[in-house]
């Protein structure tokens, strides 16, 4: 048999076998494209040296395995799934001790198309549709950590519940809504501890030459019910490894729910990018004055090596 005949026989014998691609990530896909499986993960290491400058706490000099994630994602016809755990920042208690694997994404989804729109519904734990800085994956952040208000009580990153996203076919606009009852963290949630959270986010792209040259504007709203009687907001400064909580309201009783909104904008022009976000959060109390928290973040960067 000639070489061409052998190649033809091999092609015919393997036409129904799954396809394995390694561009960027390893991915296994069925020959007809009806199902896929992809292992995912990331490792990020952080070194930090802080000067507390007379604040009454000790300086900090140390390292941290900031993220060590492992998981998988894929699709089965119109259904999708994703599960990812973090082995680095797992199970932190009030003393910042790590004990168990922390669950990040854990959901199933269903997607469909109608007219020129796409609809995706998720059940499980995924990103809360609210702020921009909490929605951006850590894989694409310029810095190791997010702004102080992001991924916290006033702007949560992931929670467990139901989410829906409606987008145009060309992704020029998007509307997202979610109903959640807290983060799974190590496997469960308690509605009495966190209450109900309703969130809504919309965004549109007024300018888009291609995926590397665009401007996006967005806004979000979040309402949290009063199932939990206590409120507390605290956050580290500078680094996740610095365990001094300079921002700390302590626990305030009589919590009666909260409302928050966020406005944001981002732009990409080749190797240059910029983004900004403003957040306003108000916590209501039965027996104390309301707590108003505002925050903003501005970021800009340029890739010297030409990436976008």
Give short role names for the model-derived ranges:
Residues 1-15:
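Cleavable N-terminal export/targeting peptides
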Residues 18-23:
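Extended acidic, Ser/Thr- and Pro-enriched interaction/regulatory segments
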Residues 54, 192-292:
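Surface-exposed beta-loop-beta
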Residues 24-226, 293-308:
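Outer membrane beta-barrel
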Residues 13-15, 57-59, 252:
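Intrinsically disordered, low-complexity segments enriched in polar/charged residues with Gly/Pro
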């Amino acid at each position: 048999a000639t070489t061409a005949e052998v190649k033809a026989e091999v092609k015919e014998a393997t036409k129904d076998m799954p396809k394995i691609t390694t561009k960027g990530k390893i991915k296994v896909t069925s020959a007809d494209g009806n199902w896929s499986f992809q292992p995912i993960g990331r490792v990020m290491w952080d070194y930090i040296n802080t000067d507390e400058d007379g604040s009454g706490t000790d300086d900090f000099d140390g390292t941290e395995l900031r993220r060590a994630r492992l998981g998988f994602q894929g699709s089965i016809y119109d259904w999708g799934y994703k599960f990812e755990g973090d082995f680095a920042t797992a199970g932190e208690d009030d003393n910042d001790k790590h004990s168990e694997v922390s669950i990040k994404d854990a959901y199933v989804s269903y997607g469909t198309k109608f007219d020129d729109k796409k609809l995706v519904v998720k059940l499980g734990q995924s990103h809360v549709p609210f702020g921009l800085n909490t929605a951006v994956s850590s894989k694409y952040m310029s810095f190791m950590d997010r702004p102080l208000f992001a991924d916290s009580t006033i702007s949560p990153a992931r929670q467990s519940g139901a989410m829906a996203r409606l987008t145009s076919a060309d992704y020029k606009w998007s509307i997202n809504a979610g109903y959640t009852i807290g983060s799974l963290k190590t496997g469960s949630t308690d509605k009495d501890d966190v209450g109900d959270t309703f969130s809504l986010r919309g965004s549109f792209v007024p300018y888009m030459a291609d995926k590397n040259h665009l401007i996006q504007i967005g806004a979000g709203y979040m309402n949290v019910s009063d199932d939990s009687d206590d409120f507390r907001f605290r956050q580290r400064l500078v680094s996740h490894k610095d365990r001094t909580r300079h921002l700390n309201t302590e626990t305030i009783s009589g919590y009666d729910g909260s409302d928050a909104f966020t406005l944001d904008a981002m732009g990409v022009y080749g190797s240059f990018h910029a983004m900004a976000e403003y957040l306003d959060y108000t916590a209501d109390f039965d027996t104390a004055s309301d707590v108003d928290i505002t925050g903003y973040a501005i970021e800009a960067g340029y890739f010297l090596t030409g990436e976008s």
